[in-house]
Amino acid sequence: MDRFLVKGAVGSLKRRMEQEQTGGGPAGLAEEEGNSKKNPRRAAPGNGVDSAGLTWGRIRAEGLNCDYTILFGKAEADEIFQELEKEVEYFTGALARVQVFGKWHSVPRKQATYGDTGLTYTFSGLTLSPKPWIPVLERVRDRVSLVTGQTFNFVLINRYKDGQDHIGEHRDDERELALGSPIASVSFGACRDFVFRHKDSRGKHPSRRLEVVRLQLAHGSLLMMNHPTNTHWYHSLPVRKKVLAPRVNLTFRKILPTTKRTTLLTASASVGSFALHS
């Protein structure tokens, strides 16, 4: 049986925020959130309120360590969403395609990267140089840093035009990531299901059967994926044909500059312990 953890763990905070705001959200958002037919089977354990007044849902399982909150009130989230739609420049051409088993396919979503000058990052076999930060991304990044105490120098942006766009099971375990650093996932637009599956529970004949953990990532929400989550758990955003509205997701990361990465690779290779991931 799947373990269904929805945003209800911080629902009371979200409702208070929305009562203070006026106006509607992105087209289709309220309908998608309000008319969901899925009921929570278990609330997120260990919830608490931090010094900034944010209510956090603590999501824990074997090797799974995540924290979830509503970071932006509705009006501010709407404003940021509209700015992202206007300002972000997404990949085109070859960068919008991916090679799988020798065949090239269009990526089922739009992608972009922004970050500090001089960084490179490998994603799905592509080595990317991020675009310079723009104000709307700095605004979100700085808010995340303020409430978490973490710093980030890179962001990967995924835009899902509707529920047909998706991303398959994967782990964010690229060698460029600073060892043990968290990934901050901020969502704007349509509420979408987000699924965690343990590495030992994948495939037709898994070695173990651990519960799948399902979340619903709301407009303006922050999901902190802390170490060692990406070591043990794959995550995905599955197809949801009934979702008609777009979603934009920002995943803030801390990646190593090329010089430090080369030093780490050389040192690790000398003891035969470095494994490459793409």
Swiss-Prot record:
Boundaries of every Fe2OG dioxygenase domain copy: 151-256
Positions annotated to bind 2-oxoglutarate: 158, 160, 170, 235, 247, 251, 253
Record keyword Magnesium present: yes
The keyword DNA repair is assigned to this record: yes
PROSITE patterns in the cross-refs: FE2OG_OXY
Alphabetical keyword list: Dioxygenase, DNA damage, DNA repair, Iron, Magnesium, Metal-binding, Nucleus, Oxidoreductase
Cellular compartments per GO CC: nucleolus; nucleoplasm
Regulation: Activated by ascorbate and magnesium ions.
Family (UniProt): Belongs to the alkB family.
Protein name: DNA oxidative demethylase ALKBH2
Organism: Bos taurus
